[in-house]
Amino acid sequence: MSVAEIKKSDVVAQFARGANDTGSPEVQVALLTTRINELTVHFKAHTKDHHSRRGLLRMVSRRRKLLDYLKGKDADRYRALIEKLGLRK
């Protein structure tokens, strides 16, 4: 297993709602958040990497849409996820 696969499986295990859950909004948002955080560190060193920045903005938009969906479906799960991930300070 690569390092990325190990990190991914750890995140899925932490945020999964069930044993084989990989597609719930909580898991998807958590995976996107870890990738966004890794890219944020990358951009501190590579400020002119505009091609990757476009991908970052796309991930942020996707996370925002998933959070909006979750907020509309179940506000309690939304609040718990935001608190667990440390978003919205």
From Swiss-Prot:
GO terms under biological process: translation
Q: Which CDD domains match?
A: Ribosomal_S15p_S13e
Q: Give UniProt keywords alphabetically.
A: Ribonucleoprotein, Ribosomal protein, RNA-binding, rRNA-binding
Pfam families with a match to the protein in the record: Ribosomal_S15
Mind telling me which InterPro entries this protein's record contains? Ribosomal_uS15, Ribosomal_uS15_bac-type, uS15_NS1_RNA-bd_sf
Cellular component terms, GO, for this chain's entry?
cytosolic small ribosomal subunit
Molecular-function GO terms, alphabetical: rRNA binding; structural constituent of ribosome
**Superkingdom of origin:** Bacteria
Q: What does this protein do?
A: One of the primary rRNA binding proteins, it binds directly to 16S rRNA where it helps nucleate assembly of the platform of the 30S subunit by binding and bridging several RNA helices of the 16S rRNA. Forms an intersubunit bridge (bridge B4) with the 23S rRNA of the 50S subunit in the ribosome.
PANTHER family of this UniProt entry? RIBOSOMAL PROTEIN S15, BACTERIAL AND ORGANELLAR (PTHR23321), SMALL RIBOSOMAL SUBUNIT PROTEIN US15M (PTHR23321:SF26)
Q: Which family does it belong to?
A: Belongs to the universal ribosomal protein uS15 family.
Assembly information from the UniProt record: Part of the 30S ribosomal subunit. Forms a bridge to the 50S subunit in the 70S ribosome, contacting the 23S rRNA.
What is the protein name stated in its UniProt record?
Small ribosomal subunit protein uS15
UniProt source species: Paraburkholderia phymatum (strain DSM 17167 / CIP 108236 / LMG 21445 / STM815)
